[in-house]
Amino acid sequence: MNYVIIISADITVHKENMNMVEYKHYVKSYEAEVLKVFTESFVNYPLFWGVFEDRFKSEEKLRSFYERLIKGIFRATVRKDDCYIGIENGKVTVIVIVEKPSDKPVGFWDYAVSGMAGIIARIGLRDTLKYMELSDKTEVVVKSIPEPRWHLYFLAVDPKYQKLGHGSGAIQDFLIPLVRSNGGNLITVTTNSEKNVPFYTNNGFTLIKEETLEYKAKTIGNWSFRMDL
């Protein structure tokens, strides 16, 4: 794939065969569309869906809970970390959320003001805190790295555009140039989906640890990666 990459203060544009993905900073006016793509991208993802599958009597109730959870996670994360959206033919197709070395971590207060009360009402305070503890454990390995790092928190691609190279393009032609242009030389990422492992290794990440984490009676895999630029 041959891309022309145009970088300005706020926008990166990729052109391939006259198709264009324009990356820009997320702004509130895109919230409804971005939340739709973000929500649809992570259906069945182990950390956000799988650990709760046995908790609800119907898939409809599970879906309702999942949507509340994932929207709250998005809103909490973008309070601290940079969010970029890839727009193609006027539609949001890709979402990239990245934590810079200077960013403060997302904390309980960020979640509290982003809809956490609705989660507590459905699964209780104790299980909510246990879930937050599980989420923290997914990042223990990468947070132990002493060098300054850029962390790819989320890479979401609209399901209608998956397997078309959008995810790889977001890493190779947007994220890596973004990090390099800001003086960075290390990117980390974690995933809880085994099918994502070859995606990241094929895009230049090195697997540094594979582990199993527990939440109540459920277990999920956790894979941690780094890319040295």
Which ranges hold each PLM region?
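A short beta-loop-alpha structural element at the N-terminal edge
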Residues: 21-36, 40-49, 100
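Active-site rim helix/loop that mediates acceptor-substrate recognition in acyltransferases
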Residues: 56-82
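Conserved beta-hairpin
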Residues: 79-96
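Conserved acyl-donor/pantetheine-binding loop and adjacent beta-alpha core of acyl/acetyltransferases
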Residues: 95-156, 214-216
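Conserved GNAT acetyl-CoA-binding A-motif
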Residues: 149-150, 179-192
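Conserved acetyl-CoA-binding loop-helix of GNAT-fold acetyltransferases
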Residues: 163-177
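Conserved catalytic-core motifs of GNAT/GCN5-like acyltransferases
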Residues: 188, 206-224
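Conserved active-site alpha-helix within GNAT-family acetyltransferase domains
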Residues: 193-210
